[in-house]
Amino acid sequence: MMPRMTGKADLNTLVHKLHPLEIKVLKNCAMDEILSTSLLISRLGFKEGHANQAFSWLRAKRIIEEHQREQMRSFELTPCGYAAASDGTAEERMLTFLSSPPSLTAIADAAEHLHPRPPLCNGLSLPELAHALTLAPKDVGSAFGILAQEGILRMDGEKRIHIVSPHVSDRMSLTRTLLQRAAARVASPSEASDTPPGTLFESELSDDERRVMERIAKKRGASDSLFKVSVRERVTFTFTPTARAVQEALHTAGLTGNEIGALTVECLKSGAWKTQHLRRYNVHIPPARIIPGRSNAYADFLEHIKDRLVALGFQEFDGPLVETDFWNADALFMPQFHPARDIHDVYYLKHPTHAPTIPEPFLSRVAATHERGADSGSLGWRYSFDRDFTRRLLLRSQGTALSARHLPTAHIPGKYFGIARCFRHDQVDATHLADFYQTEGIVLGTDVNVCTLLGMLKILATEIAGAQEVRYVGGYFPFTEPSIELHALHPALGWFELGGAGLLRPEVTDPLGVHVPVMAWGLGVDRMALLALGISDVRELFSPDIESVRLRV
């Protein structure tokens, strides 16, 4: 806000900083006038945006102040309204057509479009009327419903339309009046108005017209209505006591608002700069803030993980978000109807509920392993495997489902990874989300062992996530043995789990045709990002605050 002026020096400085738009307002408006956008448009030829900008600047300098603010409700003609104003509404066209029908040939052509031999004496059906009037069937049906309610039309037992009373209802008459008044403003819009052409203000309507307008105007989805409801705010201003002194100073300085604001090639060639005043510029005003484009930090981190793992010789794999219970759990030796299944509280699909099939021979092998261990050297879980249960569809709850899907086609030796979006019914907090990313990886080979796995986990935690301290904790996962939890120290959150890892059990690998050691891990990428990006709440990764992206170094 501008400081209050204390002398002629301040006043002289102010007037030379005024924009040409502000100067024109001060030079062409009386001190006792009520200032409005429409006034500046009509008197000064301003566009609406220029008028609003001039008011904003003058108000900031305390030269004008707000006088009145009011909500103005108006009704603007839609494209549908334009057509109705010139060609008639659907009700008008139907009533005119039925009251003074065209030649029998035209009616017969309309009827022949739908029926070979229409009984013309009983009138036309709604589809025949729609064809004859070239209107959409829904518009004809809606128009008939209104006219039938008003007792003007009726439908007989053969669904043919007849006129009961050929009079025009008060509603139709008022609708025609409103359309004609609005159309007149489309043809000759007022130059002093800052509202769109074809607009009627609620304040100028009678009570009866207002009731009709409520039926034919919509605020949203107005494409099929005659009018669109618009609510605009109208603000008027008055000059402050300061304005008179500023106006006098403008006169003394000889400023007109036509000063040159930019030295163009034409201005230099013509020599106009020699005779016209140049507008003063305040070089102390800070420049406009430049906001360069920036990529999202979390998206960059996801790409960083991929780049590092590819550089280590890994191949990326992917899979569907909607998964079957088979690949999400059964193929990982997680028993059906067992507490171990509660590790992942999943989202099941409402429709469709089941996949058509599960590929063989993997279904039979996995079922046999669950029931009796098969050739894995295990006793299995000793229950009857439910082949219908395993086809249930759900949102993938763990990235390890990708590993299970790709084990049958994996090369030996081979290294694979994926960035998987997973979904669980978790309580959202600083380290948990209901949908999150995991980085999933497997390494197959005869020389794979726990030492290999620990080394890989350290690379993931320290070199990729940027953890300063890590530790390995024994854990339990139904599909690995041994099972290891990877923990990292966060500066604000303390120690927390990054994810789990281990060597896949034979009950997982054998049914899928793999007979060499396989190490696997599934780490929470969101938690890795807490360390890498220096934040303490995973919810910040998905924040709508664009300023946090703009200010990122």
From Swiss-Prot:
Under the heading PROSITE patterns, the entry gives: AA_TRNA_LIGASE_II
User: One GO term of the cellular component aspect?
Assistant: cytoplasm
One GO biological process term: phenylalanyl-tRNA aminoacylation
Query: Catalytic activity annotated for this protein?
Result: tRNA(Phe) + L-phenylalanine + ATP = L-phenylalanyl-tRNA(Phe) + AMP + diphosphate + H(+)
UniProt remark on cofactor binding: Binds 2 magnesium ions per tetramer.
What EC number(s) does its UniProt record assign?
6.1.1.20
GO MF annotation, one: magnesium ion binding
- Keyword annotations of the record: Aminoacyl-tRNA synthetase, ATP-binding, Cytoplasm, Ligase, Magnesium, Metal-binding, Nucleotide-binding, Protein biosynthesis
One Pfam match, given by its short name, reads tRNA-synt_2d
* SUPFAM superfamilies recorded: Class II aaRS and biotin synthetases (SSF55681)
Residues noted as binding L-phenylalanine in the record, renumbered to the chain: T400, F479
Cofactors named for this entry: Mg(2+)
Identify the enzyme class.
ligase
Q: What is this protein called?
A: Phenylalanine--tRNA ligase alpha subunit
What organism does this protein naturally occur in? Treponema pallidum (strain Nichols)
Q: Which gene encodes it?
A: pheS
